[in-house]
């Protein structure tokens, strides 16, 4: 008699719902998943090894490219580790700016996650709405750093520069006439803080729009409720952090438990779920966007009232300002030496972790007293979540696999490193 065996097939690495170069070896019995074996490494770029051959200040840009949806949050973890080794603390204004941009980054991440998650499950409209809001936040990145994604804005000792007094403006083109451009530039007449304040005033109603399309939608709930359940106890055992852990009912958030930057000075709540399924992960991230909006408004109010320095006054670490560097020969040499050779970091080791949008993003640095790190180890926030794919998917239908992958919010820049 012929042996009856399960069917095995490849999911990815070129699948549009794989969220990057993910390859899953899926074993099914009919339509029911029996086993999943994730294969990673297709986006490995040896970031940790590259950091060992570069001065400390030249590796900040690599952090942007790990989780390339949560750029400044990655920078924050790396910069905090260097500041621990150097024994320095940034000015309070720089802390508030970092807090504000960490939360802008959180909203950027969650908007992309929500749009992609909805699209994977079959809801096209939300995807378009989310990218509409992301444009405004990308413009905030561009205003402070000149780049829409890879900002390299956080520096050991503070931030690259203070917030600008004006916003980039749209110009007439073949697609937008002067009347349309004038309307598009209405919110851009003031400073960056004015623009962010205007966005935070509009954003809660926009979140309501997303919820009106999804939260009580019968099809959405059928595709997400009771799918990919992880209990609180099991989530802790698997090393879950961030929204994945909180959706399982564990109230753990580094911003509250181990405050950094200005998080101990702002008021916000930690949303938690009950069931630990795809639907709870959605609800937790939706509420996180509301709380991030609340934090940003508090930061804007404080920054308007409290001008001050955004970088420490230590010329062994901080290069001269560009205006000074272009006028003075000694400042030019100083600037050149710091950016090419960097600075000496005392011997020691430090671990710094931040509550990145996907979970705990940690950076462990070992210094041997040189201008380059002896070893850099990155704790990717979403790595443990992907490792639990087999447990979350077993017993579900093939169609549920896509919903579970998109609910865990993975980016292979940081998983493969």
UniProtKB/Swiss-Prot annotation:
Its EC number is 7.1.1.-. GO terms for molecular function: NAD binding; NADH:ubiquinone reductase (non-electrogenic) activity; quinone binding. It is found in: Cell inner membrane. Signal peptide: none annotated. Its main location: membrane. Pfam families: Complex1_49kDa. It is a peripheral membrane protein. InterPro entries: NADH_Q_OxRdtase_suD, NADH_UbQ_OxRdtase_49kDa_CS, NDH1_su_D/H, NiFe-Hase_large. It is an enzyme of class 7 (translocase). Belongs to the complex I 49 kDa subunit family. NDH-1 is composed of 14 different subunits. Subunits NuoB, C, D, E, F, and G constitute the peripheral sector of the complex. This is NADH-quinone oxidoreductase subunit D.
């Amino acid at each position: 008699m012929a042996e009856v065996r399960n069917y095995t097939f490849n999911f990815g690495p070129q699948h549009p719902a794989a969220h990057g170069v993910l390859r899953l070896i899926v074993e099914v019995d009919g339509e029911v998943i029996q086993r999943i074996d994730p294969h990673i490494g297709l986006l490995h770029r040896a970031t940790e090894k590259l950091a060992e051959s570069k001065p400390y200040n030249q590796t900040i840009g690599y952090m942007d490219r790990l989780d390339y949806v949560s750029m400044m949050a990655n920078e924050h973890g790396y910069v905090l580790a260097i500041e621990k080794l150097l024994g320095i603390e940034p000015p309070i204004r720089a802390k508030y700016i970092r807090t504000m941009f960490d939360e802008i980054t959180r909203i950027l991440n969650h908007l992309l996650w929500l749009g992609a998650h909805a699209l994977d499950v079959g809801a096209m409209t939300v995807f378009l709405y989310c990218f509409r809001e992301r444009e405004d936040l990308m413009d905030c990145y561009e205003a402070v750093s000149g780049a829409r994604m890879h900002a390299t804005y956080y520096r050991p000792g503070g931030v690259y520069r203070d917030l600008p007094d004006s916003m980039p403006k749209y110009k007439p083109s073949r697609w937008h006439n002067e009347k349309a451009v004038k309307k598009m530039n209405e919110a851009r007449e003031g400073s960056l803080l004015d623009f962010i304040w205007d966005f935070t005033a509009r954003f809660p109603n926009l979140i309501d729009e997303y919820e009106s399309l999804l939260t009580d939608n019968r099809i959405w709930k059928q595709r997400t409720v009771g799918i990919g359940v992880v209990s609180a106890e099991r989530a802790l055992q698997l090393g879950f952090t961030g929204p994945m852990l909180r959706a399982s009912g564990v109230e753990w958030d580094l911003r509250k438990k181990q405050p950094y930057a200005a998080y101990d000075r702002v008021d916000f709540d930690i949303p938690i779920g009950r069931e630990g399924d795809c639907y709870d992960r959605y609800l937790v991230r939706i509420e996180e966007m509301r709380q991030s909006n609340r934090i940003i408004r508090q930061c804007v109010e404080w920054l308007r009232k409290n001008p001050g320095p955004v970088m420490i006054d230590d010329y062994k670490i901080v290069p001269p300002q560009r205006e000074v560097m272009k006028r003075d020969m000694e400042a030019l040499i100083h600037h050149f030496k710091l950016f090419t050779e960097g600075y000496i970091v005392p011997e020691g080791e430090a671990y710094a972790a931040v509550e990145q949008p996907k979970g705990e993003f940690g950076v462990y640095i070992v210094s041997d007293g040189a201008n380059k790190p002896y070893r850099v180890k990155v704790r990717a926030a979403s790595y443990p979540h992907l490792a639990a794919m087999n447990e979350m998917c077993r017993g579900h239908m093939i169609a549920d696999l896509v919903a579970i992958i998109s609910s865990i919010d993975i980016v292979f820049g940081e998983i493969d490193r």
